[in-house]
Amino acid sequence: MTKHKSWSNSTLNLYEQCAFKYMCVKIAKIPQPESHHLTKGLAAHSVAENYLLGKIEEPPFVLNKFTKEFKKLKELGAIPEEAFTLNNKWELIPDGWRSKDAWLRLKLDARIDNYLVDFKTGRHYDEHLNQAMLYANVMMLVNPSYDDIEVEFWYLNSGQVKTYDFNRKNLKADIEHWEERVDKMMNDTVYAPTPNEYCKYCYVKNICPVKGGE
């Protein structure tokens, strides 16, 4: 079985939620059914990107709880859907999304210098702090002049905003934190299932060693 040699925040979250499901999705590549929540999220991100690119004149309805904020992003020239690819030495690979050396991939929904914004169509989860930290860590690595990074999460349905601030003094410890978690994922050979609150929605539960047949 071919191992997965690259990661993203969502991939790592999937593994830590359930290693068996991670194996099914990322290694065995068992096709996933269509998800209403995923489709909704992709649509909102596409609309936001096209508005910031000037292809849509006014913020569409799906963004209406943040109309003023989106107008300000556009006015200030925010970069939408900015992609970054790093190798396993945490070095930037320019235009490297499909590179054979790609180790970490991420996309920022919007950025103005050291101010980053992520758009969410779901609710707030504590794990979003880790996502914010990863974005800030990568931004510090690719922009050595940035010592402080502010990351905001805009929850498009509720209008809620979460703000996180990061400083370069923590970068070394943060990198060690990521490497420890990623090494565990990439060196796993067992992929043991982890029963959790999401099992009842899991599309591979019928073949799960724990949940199969339920």
Predicted regions and their residues:
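Short amphipathic alpha-helical segments and their helix-coil junctions
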Residues: 2-4, 20-32, 114-117, 179-189
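Nuclease catalytic cores
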Residues: 5-56, 81-82
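Metal-dependent nuclease catalytic regions and adjoining charged, substrate-binding loops involved
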Residues: 6-7, 80-82, 87-94, 100-101, ...
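Short coil/turn segments at secondary-structure boundaries
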Residues: 26-28, 36-38, 59-61, 76-83, ...
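Short, polar/flexible loop-turn hinges at active-site or ligand-entry regions and domain interfaces
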Residues: 30-36, 123-124, 189-192
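Short amphipathic alpha-helical face segments that pack within enzyme cores
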Residues: 43, 130-138
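Catalytic cores of nuclease domains that cleave nucleic-acid phosphodiester backbones
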Residues: 47-116, 123-130, 144-152
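Short small-residue beta-strand/loop micro-motif enriched in glycine and branched aliphatics
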Residues: 116-119, 161-163
